[in-house]
Amino acid sequence: MSHTKEILIDSKHPLFDKSGMFYKEFPSDYRQVRFFSMLIVQKAPAEIKEINLLEQQISELIKNAVRHGNKKDPAKKVRVWASFSTGHAHLIVEDEGEGFQQVEEWNKFNNKRNECFENHNFEELENYFSYRTPESTEDDGGNALFAAVEYWDGGVVFNDKKNAIAVYKNFNEKKRPGIEISSS
């Protein structure tokens, strides 16, 4: 059985080191999340943009901060620190909310979900398609976090208050992901 990736909780984790990172602050305007994401991802080298997958992952982190953390209150800010190279993407996204207090519960849910999948127990897996809390709306489902723990292979960590998330993605510098254009 493979090891299930988990979200950590540790304000002192090295991924929360903001040294040398680009900083940007945004109002919690849900309609502009994609625009805010593009402002961040434009700092990344073309080699790691992966046909907009990086932008999509950044967008989900900002969207969660605006929607779940700040409850779409435009008076509240989302703060983003970012660092990019051809070998990595490192982000910290912080909101002014109460924090995602269900991280441990989400980890248990995700572990059970992965266990069902690995054991081909698809009938039981039906119970683990979508993670929901009492605050969840019709279109919430925890899918952004499921994708995040897979995409951000260098770690996904919340601070102790659980209102900031730090993520890290490693890129193979020899293999340049993205679209290859040939002249033939």
What are these model-predicted stretches?
Residues 49-79:
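Conserved ATP-binding N-box helix of the HATPase_c
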Residues 163-174:
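Short C-terminal beta-strand
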Residues 36-60, 133-138:
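Conserved short strand/loop->alpha-helix "switch" segment adjacent to the catalytic nucleotide/phosphoryl-transfer site
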